[in-house]
Amino acid sequence: MDFGITKTIPASAGQQTADALYDGSLSEYEFHMAGSPSKLQVGHYVYTIFQNQLIGRLRIRALLPGAVNPKSGKPRTLIIVEAPGERLENPIPKQGHRGTRYTDGEDWPA
């Protein structure tokens, strides 16, 4: 198992965004996390959920603290991941969610 977080790609971002993370059209992508991560490190993974399915994972390249949410003014961390990531051939049902959740990668196939 490989430690990381799960992030849901909003439906408003569309299938095109979900595909771009894994098809080679991007070299990196930015996710946001409220506050400062207590357990997350460079080299861990962001597991992506789209339309209530775990579709893949991307390795974390950098954690950039000190950003501010423009809507709330609260601190957040930018999570830069390497793309393309590893896409599952057969997505796994996984309920989408708001925010960030830590995971041991238990849903990732061995």
Regions found by a protein language model. Give the residues of each.
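Short conserved beta-strand and strand-loop elements enriched in small hydrophobics
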Residues: 44-49
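Short, well-ordered beta-strand micro-motif
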Residues: 59, 80-82
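Compositionally biased, charged N-terminal/linker segments
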Residues: 1-42, 75-77, 85-110
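Short, solvent-exposed secondary-structure boundary/capping segments
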Residues: 64-80
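Short beta-strand-centered aromatic/proline hotspots
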Residues: 55-66
